[in-house]
Swiss-Prot record:
The keyword Ribosomal protein applies. InterPro entries: Ribosomal_bL28/bL31-like_sf (IPR034704), Ribosomal_bL31 (IPR002150), Ribosomal_bL31_B (IPR027493), Ribosomal_bL31_sf (IPR042105). It comes from Listeria monocytogenes serovar 1/2a (strain ATCC BAA-679 / EGD-e). One of its GO terms (biological process) is translation. Part of the 50S ribosomal subunit. Belongs to the bacterial ribosomal protein bL31 family. Type B subfamily. One of its GO terms (cellular component) is ribosome. This is Large ribosomal subunit protein bL31B.
C-alpha cells in the first residue's frame, strides 16, 4: 500500500443513542468527542442512531410481512382459490 493516502484506522467507541449501548470497534471515522472506556484509555466517541442492540432484526422484534399482499388481493377480487 502507498503511504500517506490511507485514512488512519484506530479504535473508536460507538454509542447507540436510542439504547445508550456502547461498544469499542475500529474505524477510520474521526470525532471531536472522546470518552474514557472501561480499560482506562480515552477513545473518540461516535454516536449512531441504530446498532445491533436496537435494530429489530437483532432484537427479535422484527415484523414479518403478512400474507395479504398483491397476489392475495388479486385472488380475493376475482374469486380465485
Amino acid at each position: 500500500m502507498k503511504t500517506g493516502i490511507h485514512p488512519e484506522y484506530r479504535p473508536v467507541v460507538f454509542v447507540d443513542t436510542s439504547t445508550d449501548f456502547k461498544f469499542l470497534s475500529g474505524s477510520t471515522k474521526s470525532s471531536s468527542e472522546t470518552i474514557k472506556w472501561e480499560d482506562g484509555n480515552e477513545y473518540p466517541l461516535l454516536r449512531v442512531e441504530i446498532s445491533s442492540d436496537s435494530h429489530p432484526f437483532y432484537t427479535g422484534k422484527q415484523k414479518h410481512a403478512t400474507a395479504d399482499g398483491r397476489v392475495d388481493r388479486f385472488n380475493k377480487k376475482y374469486g380465485l382459490k
